[in-house]
UniProtKB/Swiss-Prot annotation:
CDD domains: RHOD_YbbB. It comes from Escherichia coli (strain K12). It catalyses: 5-methylaminomethyl-2-thiouridine(34) in tRNA + selenophosphate + (2E)-geranyl diphosphate + H2O + H(+) = 5-methylaminomethyl-2-selenouridine(34) in tRNA + (2E)-thiogeraniol + phosphate + diphosphate; 5-methylaminomethyl-2-thiouridine(34) in tRNA + (2E)-geranyl diphosphate = 5-methylaminomethyl-S-(2E)-geranyl-thiouridine(34) in tRNA + diphosphate; 5-methylaminomethyl-S-(2E)-geranyl-thiouridine(34) in tRNA + selenophosphate + H(+) = 5-methylaminomethyl-2-(Se-phospho)selenouridine(34) in tRNA + (2E)-thiogeraniol; 5-methylaminomethyl-2-(Se-phospho)selenouridine(34) in tRNA + H2O = 5-methylaminomethyl-2-selenouridine(34) in tRNA + phosphate. InterPro entries: Rhodanese-like_dom (IPR001763), Rhodanese-like_dom_sf (IPR036873), SelU (IPR017582). This is tRNA 2-selenouridine synthase. Involved in the post-transcriptional modification of the uridine at the wobble position (U34) of tRNA(Lys), tRNA(Glu) and tRNA(Gln). Catalyzes the conversion of 2-thiouridine (S2U-RNA) to 2-selenouridine (Se2U-RNA). Acts in a two-step process involving geranylation of 2-thiouridine (S2U) to S-geranyl-2-thiouridine (geS2U) and subsequent selenation of the latter derivative to 2-selenouridine (Se2U) in the tRNA chain. Keywords: Selenium, Transferase. The gene is selU.
Length: 364
């Protein structure tokens, strides 16, 4: 039975999106997991805690005996059924626990007794995690071009269309602004970093990559922060700035934040609840920058937002949102971005409309 235990093996697993049956407890999985992993634990959180306490008080033999006692009979059979189904569904997969120790070996031996030979990751999640961290450090050393521009400039789409682009906001499940949340919850910090490492490894493996194309992000994207090694390299990177007409930016923002988000919320929750979630999403975004807008201006824009939502609900038109979106861009977002860009003006190497920047990046 082949087992994976070298750095290259670990990288190959991440590049291939090899299915990983992660037998750690749910609390461990939630703290950090690999992108292609599914959590089918040997022990649940309470069982793991009990075994851990027993280990500290009575030693390894007593803890092992307790573990076998807790995971027995119908409980063991239910978990065996889940592992067996996952193995059959993912014949190229691999088992994983925290460090490649007893848990994955126990599950492997039980599966073997049931007629299923399934490999495991020697070193477990810890080894994969260290591989992900090291890969990011190494790959971040390649040259980087950042795509900058005011809100609504289509930066994310431009990055997505580059073969050497990595969509940081897509990986973080957040668009990086007060209105940036998506319907997908953000990953834990470790899981986000693992996903980023896997994406960089896959992108690098597909081609003879000379440089990265990334969006000009701040350190935080929602609740996730960029790995320091990558963030440091981004502060030194060249910047290409998209400068599209204001009207085109408004069209993009209308599509992204009003039409698409309304569709996504109603698709996920149904018409009535979806509408309420959509309204709450917009109000939450505006409320997040209340202090910077000042109370009076915030109240004015919030009233315009309410009026726009009433119009959208009764007519289906999103045009009313321009009454609060335009001043929000002109008074807050655009001045803020231009101020930030001025501080790194020496890094700007190209300016142009979206298509011009895309062509410039393609020629790098």
């Amino acid at each position: 039975m082949q087992e994976r235990h070298t750095e290259q093996d670990y990288r190959a697993l991440l590049i291939a999106d090899t299915p990983i049956i992660d037998v750690r407890a749910p609390i461990e999985f939630e703290h950090g997991a690999m992108p292609a992993a599914i959590n089918l634990p040997l022990m649940n959180n309470d069982e793991r805690a009990a075994v851990g306490t027993c280990y500290k008080q009575q030693g390894s033999d007593a803890a092992l005996a307790l573990g076998h006692k807790l995971v027995a009979g119908e409980i063991r059979q239910q978990r065996m059924d889940a592992w067996r189904a996952a193995c059959l569904q993912n014949p190229q997969g691999i088992l994983c626990c925290a460090r490649g120790g007893q848990r994955s070996h126990i599950v492997q031996s039980w599966l073997h007794a049931a007629g299923i030979d399934y490999p495991l990751v020697e070193g477990g999640y810890k080894a994969l995690r260290q591989t992900a961290i090291q890969a990011t450090i190494e790959l971040a050393q390649k040259p980087i071009v950042l795509i900058g521009g005011c809100t609504g400039s289509g930066k994310t789409l431009l990055v997505q269309q580059q073969p050497n682009g990595v969509d940081l906001e897509g990986l973080a499940r957040h668009r990086g602004s007060a209105f940036g949340r998506t319907l997908q919850p953000q990953l834990s910090q470790a899981s986000f970093e693992n996903l980023l490492a896997a994406e960089m490894l896959k992108t690098d493996a597909r081609q003879n990559l000379r440089l990265w194309v990334l969006e000009d992000e701040s350190r935080m994207i929602g609740s996730n922060h960029l790995p320091e090694c990558l963030r440091e390299r981004m502060t030194q990177a060249a910047i290409a700035v998209v400068e599209d007409p204001f009207e085109i930016r408004l069209e993009r923002l209308n599509e992204e934040y009003f039409l698409r988000m309304h569709h996504d919320f109603t698709h996920a929750y149904g018409d009535e609840q979806g509408w309420q979630e959509y309204c709450e999403y917009l109000h939450h975004g505006l409320s997040a920058i209340k202090r910077r807008l000042g109370l009076q201006r915030y109240n004015e824009l919030a009233a315009r937002l309410d009026a726009a939502l009433t119009t959208q609900l009764t007519t289906g038109s999103t045009d009313g949102h321009l009454a609060w979106l335009v001043p929000l861009l002109e008074e807050y977002y655009d001045p803020m971005y231009r101020y930030q860009l001025e501080k790194k003006a020496e890094k700007v190497v190209f300016r142009g409309e979206w298509a011009e920047v895309a062509e410039w990046v393609k020629a790098r």
